[in-house]
């Protein structure tokens, strides 16, 4: 089934990242293309759950990055936000400033205690609020490894009962738009 294949691909992807077998595939990419892809995928899910999803791109630069991996980061963070938010809102904000892409996913979901925040990036780590949810507990561990592979950082701010905010920052060079267009 599709679900089984997706779970196997998740496991294989995790082990490849964990063993340093993955390398970034860099190419010019417009930041708005990333946010548009994520918005297109997650807007229907948010609407089905009765959640408000806000997507905002502050600076639309063309950068040299691994577009698929940045989308995977956003995908995993938004997927978790959808999973652990029963009512309220979720936001995705991207910005490019001073050579750094900043991607922020914030939700009004269940939030986490300090102790849970210490464990949440661990492989196969499933918090008590995830007991009835699908998955291996690898999503955030995969995100952390992709962010590290791309030379970035991830930060979590959360409070039990008040939601979570994940901030990813990755250095990446801006690309001249003429150069980017001639390569496409």
Q: Across the structure, where does each feature detected by a protein language model lie?
A:
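Short alpha-helical segment within the cytosolic histidine kinase core of two-component systems
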Residues: 36-48
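Conserved catalytic submotifs in the C-terminal HATPase_c
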Residues: 25-30, 47, 52-61
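Conserved glycine-rich
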Residues: 151-152
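Short conserved segment of the HATPase_c
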Residues: 112-124
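Short alpha-helical Gxxx[C/S/T] motif in the catalytic ATP-binding
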Residues: 139, 143
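Short helix-loop "hinge" at the ATP-lid/N-box region of the Bergerat-fold HATPase_c
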Residues: 81-82
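Helix-loop junction within the histidine kinase core
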Residues: 15-26
